[in-house]
Amino acid sequence: MKTFSAKSHEVVHEWFVIDATDKVLGRVASEVALRLRGKHKPEYTPHVDTGDFIVVINSSKLRVTGTKGLNKIYYRHSGYPGGISSTNFDKMQDRFPGRALEKAVKGMLPKGPLGYAMIKKLKVYGDANHPHAAQQPKALEI
């Protein structure tokens, strides 16, 4: 029997919506990364984008365990000397709800053109409203 290899034009990308209210950041991120990659499908092929579109709502209500709210630090650099800045999880959630989830999922995806295409299929919204009702996303429970 020949090994099956999915073709990019034959893959069906479904839409799912996840409610992140009171969910732990890492557990949501790992499930989202798995679904974006397509590893939950039997026709998964490593070199083809077989994943689904994921819409995450209520990302402002994500939580972390222990003292990570204060102790988990996110760094970024402007490119200039001395241009490093840092913020913790709580401040990032207040300013940019959902960015912590995007960064967590991005770190779990492959680096390169395929990974960059996968992260574009993630849509994160801080509240319950999203503009993807026309795609009729199915609810996904984590």
Curated annotation (Swiss-Prot):
Under the heading InterPro entries, the entry gives: Ribosomal_uL13, Ribosomal_uL13_bac-type, Ribosomal_uL13_sf
Looking up Gene3D superfamilies in the UniProt record yields:
Ribosomal protein L13 (3.90.1180.10)
GO CC, one annotated term: cytosolic large ribosomal subunit
Q: Could you state one GO biological process linked to this protein? A: translation
Could you cite one Gene Ontology molecular function of this protein? structural constituent of ribosome
One Pfam annotation, family name?
Answer: Ribosomal_L13
Is DNA damage found in the keyword set?
Answer: no
List the SUPFAM superfamilies hit by this protein, alphabetically.
Ribosomal protein L13 (SSF52161)
Keyword annotations from UniProtKB, A to Z: Ribonucleoprotein, Ribosomal protein
The entry sums up its family as follows: Belongs to the universal ribosomal protein uL13 family.
NCBIfam families per the record? rplM_bact (TIGR01066)
Q: What does this protein do?
A: This protein is one of the early assembly proteins of the 50S ribosomal subunit, although it is not seen to bind rRNA by itself. It is important during the early stages of 50S assembly.
Q: How does it assemble?
A: Part of the 50S ribosomal subunit.
- Give the matching HAMAP family: Ribosomal_uL13 (MF_01366)
Q: What's the protein here called?
A: Large ribosomal subunit protein uL13
Whose protein is this, by species?
Polynucleobacter asymbioticus (strain DSM 18221 / CIP 109841 / QLW-P1DMWA-1)
Lineage of the native species? Bacteria, Pseudomonadati, Pseudomonadota, Betaproteobacteria, Burkholderiales
Q: Which gene encodes it?
A: rplM
